[in-house]
Each structure stands twice: as C-alpha cells, then as structure tokens.
C-alpha cells in the first residue's frame, strides 16, 4: 500500500514539474474548503497529500489540490507537523482542562485521533525531528520580545524541557509555524519591522540560531518528501490565501481558496522554485449571484459579470467582477467598487455597468445599515403590511475601464432621497439619458416603475421623476385593496421592429417571476402595457445581453429564495418584435 501511495505521488509530481525544474503551484478547488474557520494556521505534508490546519480542524488535500477528507477540532487548532505517518497539532483550549491551557494532539493519516497531551500554556507552532516533538509557547502576546520559548517532548509525550530561543530580532506572539528538514528546525514568527513575518533556523538542541532565512510562512509551511519532489536540496512549500483578507472568507462571494508555492533551501536561504499559473476556473453553480449583470466586452473577447458584496464580505460593501470566455467557467472575483464609509452601506443591490460616451458607469443601489439614518416615512395610508424602510437609493459611479475601479460620480442618490427606491437602470432616448427605477412597495404599498431624466454628464437628475406604471396593473395581481405589489429589476430593450420593451420582476403564485411590458408609443413615457409573464419558476431580476457571436440572452438569478442558493441562470431569447420569448 505504501509503495502504491509513493507511486501515485510520483505521478502527481511529474504533472506538477515544469520543464525548467520548477514546480507548478497547487491550487485548492473553490468551494471545497468552505468549512474553514478563520484562516489557515499551519501545514504539513506526506506522500499522500497536504494537511492544512485551521481554527476548527484539518483539511487533507491531494497534491492535485482536491479535498480528500477533513476533521473537526472542538478547540482552537494552530500549527501542525508531520512525521512517521502521524500529524501532530498544537491546540489552544478555549476553556482550561484541569488547569491546562494547551494540548498536543496526534492524528493518523486518515485524521483519526490516536493520542493527546495536555500542557499548561497556550501553544502554537509544531514540528517533529527524529523522536522529538517541538512546540511553541506564547507567554508574551504582542509585547515586544527578542526570543521565543520552544517546548520539547518525546513521541510518547515525556517532557524534555523548555528552551528560551533567540531569533535575532524583535517579535511578538510566540512561534506561529514550524517545519523541519530532518536535521534543523525552522520557525516562522511575526516580527516588528519589515518584513512582518520572519523565519529562524535552529539546530535540534535550540541553542544555536543558524540564520534567519527570508520566507513568508505565517499560514504554514512544511518540507516536501523526496518521494514527491526529488531534489539535491530540501524543498518546502508555503500556504498562501487567495483573493484578499483570509479572515473574511465568504462561501458564496469570496470562497476560500489556497495556493501552495514551493521553495528550495540552499546556501542558507530559501529560493523560490514556483511556476505560478492561474487558479482553476469555477462554474456559475459555484458562487452565489443576486441581480447578476453581464457585460459583453468585445474588445477583450470575454464576458464580465458584476455582483453585489456586503459590509460583512472580505472587501466590504461594493461590487465585484468575474470574467469568462464561455459564460460557464468564471474567474475568481476582483473588487471593482467599494462604497465610501460615509454612506453607511450594508449591501449593494443590482449593480449595472454601462458604457456611455467613452466612460463606464456603474448604477448601484445602496441599502444603508440599520439605524444609520432615520427610517423613511410611509407614503400610502391604510391597513397593509408594513416592514422596515431604511434609506435606499441608486448612486452612479464612474471608471475609465470596465475593470474599474469605479469611484463615486453622483453626489447623492439619483431618485429623491426621501423615497425608498432600488434597481436603477440606464436608458438613452432621443439623445437624452434617463434612469428607470423602482419606487418600493415598502413605502407606497403598490410598487411603481418610475423614470427620471439625467443631466448629460450623468451626475444628477435633470427633472422630476415620472411614473410609468404600477405593479398592480399586471393581470395576475391580487385585487385586495390592502395587497402589496412588488416592482423589481427593470431592464429596457429596443426590439428589431422598433418596439420599446421592458423586462421586470414581481411575484406570482409560483414565487418570483419575469414580465415583459411594451410601451404603446415606443417612448419611455408610455403608456405601458399589457404585462406578459414569460418566466415563473422562482427566478427574476432580468437583464439582456448579446453574446460575442450575437445571440440574445437573458440573465436572471434563480431561485429567489433562500438567499444563499441564488445562482445565475442564462437563457437564450427570441426577439419577436412586440414581445420577447425564451428560446426553448
């Protein structure tokens, strides 16, 4: 069995080895590490794969980056080390056990617990050389200190004493990560100054510091077995969190993804031997999407999807963008808009990106944080269901490129600030720019579709808003005088015969749905009607785009509930002149 595992590792090594002797980066698969708690604390490896520790447990991934198995830890798990078919982990207990605050725990390669030892202090950093377990102690916290305490014990948990080590520089906390090359111990720690993370190399007796090679290894590193990547010199890997602040992973908008980089230790320093490729693409089913907006970038020959982010996400409230060449596989997100803190934004809704007069404009609805501003008044009296009415409206942002960054362009929400509004979209008629938006049912009971002309520079409204129609005018609306009616997600389209059509959403018996409505005059002022339901499978907030090859498509999110299950659905469409049809 062992020979089979070594053979499998060798095959993987061949696939990862670049022609010039470097090693291609290993990427984990988006979505497979969604159970991570906090960030990666430590790492170790064997011929079977790589072990990544986090506050809540361990992930075991193959050398191809795919998740093999995982286990949980009911305490805060820090760094881990590997030796002789065992994984050794340093744990900090949330509640002391018999007065003990720390623990060394041991797992087999299938992540079954096979032993543990309580310790009096908080521990982090863990490695094994020969028959000795090394672990870091942290009696300092952020207090500056020159050395760190490192404890030792035998494999059967006999205490071998604690040594005060001198790392050669000011640091804070204790040793964060450890690795061993079979002869020496390498300790990663947070230092004061630049760089913020350093590494120190010690002889096994810890009395002599043999150098401070430069390596950023705060999220774990380990030596690679010769069976995986044969080399004259020891080779190590480091863990790198992709896509921003690893303390704010979000399974849908910022899924955890890790990249392993590779280093060779020779002449007292770590030398980068990594060939960094591109992360694997993910499909539309792998990330949450509410109110998706797709822009066809013909110059770049790709598609850009713009999606909301919240104040709890990694980058805060704003808009992120992904790219695709086939509308199925998408890149990791990049943040293209961050809402200024003064707006007190909890989340951005319905971001739309439009090219206009050589610039790129983002229409984004800002929903403010609870209690940040006085609640908006009810404008429709009566005994109908009323819910919270936070300040909400559509702002305009501008950039020189569809890649952003988008910065605030309008000084205030384009619709009246005392209205509860959302989902502003862009339309140009007879050379004049307009915003079409929804006046929310939460304030007026019967949601309205409203338009307002914009100034030529799109900085503000150029006139008074005018109503287009109300949600209650759709044929399947409830006749009850106290019923509420939703308007949502308008998008305007000029058909092949010159008809002006609007796609929009409301509710129906089967949930969320899509309507198409025609202007009887072909003008924005209408009148508008009738309203034809063309999709009723709990999906909506429609928009239209054409593929690079010219095919008309509709993008919606489906389902509408629950929130975390929303995904982008793309449907081919038929332009029928006076209406639109899904091409089934």
Roles of regions detected by a PLM:
Residues 8-17:
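Hydrophobic h-region of N-terminal signal peptides that target proteins for export
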Residues 20-29, 58-72, 103-115, 149-166, ...:
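Surface-exposed loop/turn elements that mediate protein-protein interactions on large endomembrane-trafficking
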Residues 48-53, 86-97, 132-142, 183-191, ...:
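Short beta-strand elements that form the blades of beta-propeller/WD-repeat-like
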């Amino acid at each position: 069995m062992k020979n089979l595992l070594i053979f499998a590792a060798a095959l993987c090594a061949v696939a990862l080895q670049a022609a010039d002797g470097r090693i291609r980066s290993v990427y984990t698969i988006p979505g497979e590490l969604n159970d991570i708690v906090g960030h990666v604390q430590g790492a170790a490896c064997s011929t079977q794969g790589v072990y990544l520790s986090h506050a809540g447990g361990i992930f075991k991934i193959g050398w191809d980056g795919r998740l093999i198995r995982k286990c949980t830890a009911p305490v805060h798990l820090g760094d881990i080390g590997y030796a002789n078919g065992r994984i050794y982990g340093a744990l900090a207990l949330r509640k002391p056990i018999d007065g003990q605050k720390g623990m060394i725990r041991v797992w087999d390669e299938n992540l079954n617990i096979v032993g543990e030892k309580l310790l009096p202090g908080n521990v982090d950093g863990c490695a094994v050389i020969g028959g000795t377990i090394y672990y870091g102690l942290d009696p300092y916290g952020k207090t500056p200190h020159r050395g760190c305490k490192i404890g030792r014990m035998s494999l059967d948990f006999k205490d071998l004493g604690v040594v005060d080590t001198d790392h050669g520089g000011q640091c804070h906390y204790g040793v964060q990560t450890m690795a061993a090359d079979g002869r020496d111990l390498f300790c990663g720690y947070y230092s004061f100054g630049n760089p913020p993370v350093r590494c120190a190399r010690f002889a096994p007796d810890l009395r002599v510091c043999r150098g401070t090679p430069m390596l950023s290894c705060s999220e774990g590193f380990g030596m690679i077995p010769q069976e995986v990547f044969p080399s004259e010199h020891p080779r190590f890997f480091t863990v790198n969190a992709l896509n921003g602040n690893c303390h704010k992973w979000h399974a849908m908008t910022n899924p955890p993804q890790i990249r392993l980089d590779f280093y060779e230790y020779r002449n007292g320093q770590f030398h980068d031997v990594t060939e960094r490729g591109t992360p694997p693409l993910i499909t539309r089913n792998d990330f949450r999407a509410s109110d998706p907006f797709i822009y066809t970038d013909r110059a770049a020959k790709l598609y850009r999807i713009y999606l909301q982010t919240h104040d709890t996400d990694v980058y805060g409230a704003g808009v992120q963008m992904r790219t695709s060449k086939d509308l199925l596989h998408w890149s990791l997100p990049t943040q293209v808009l961050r809402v200024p803190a003064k707006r007190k934004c909890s989340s951005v809704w319905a971001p739309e990106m439009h090219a206009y007069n050589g610039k790129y404009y983002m229409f984004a609805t800002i929903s403010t944080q609870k209690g940040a501003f006085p609640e908006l008044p009810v404008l429709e009296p009566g005994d109908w269901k009323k819910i919270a009415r936070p300040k909400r409206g559509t702002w305009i942002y501008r950039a020189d490129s569809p890649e952003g960054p988008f910065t605030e362009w309008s000084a205030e929400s384009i619709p009246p600030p005392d209205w509860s509004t959302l989902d502003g979209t862009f339309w140009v008629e007879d050379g004049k720019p307009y915003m079409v938006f929804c006046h929310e049912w939460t304030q007026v009971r019967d949601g309205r579709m409203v338009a307002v002309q914009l100034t030529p520079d799109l900085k503000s409204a150029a006139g008074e808003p005018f109503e287009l129609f109300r949600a209650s005018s759709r044929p399947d609306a409830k006749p009850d005088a106290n019923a509420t009616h939703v308007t949502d997600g308008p998008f305007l389209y000029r058909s092949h015969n010159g008809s002006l059509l609007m796609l929009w959403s409301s509710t129906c018996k089967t949930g969320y749905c899509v309507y198409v409505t025609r202007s009887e005059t072909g003008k924005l002022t209408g009148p508008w009607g009738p309203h034809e339901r063309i999709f009723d499978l709990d999906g909506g907030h429609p928009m239209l785009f054409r593929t690079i090859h010219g095919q008309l498509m509709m993008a919606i999110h489906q389902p509408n509930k629950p929130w975390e299950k929303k995904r982008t659905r793309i449907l081919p469409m038929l332009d029928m002149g006076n209406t639109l049809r899904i091409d089934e």
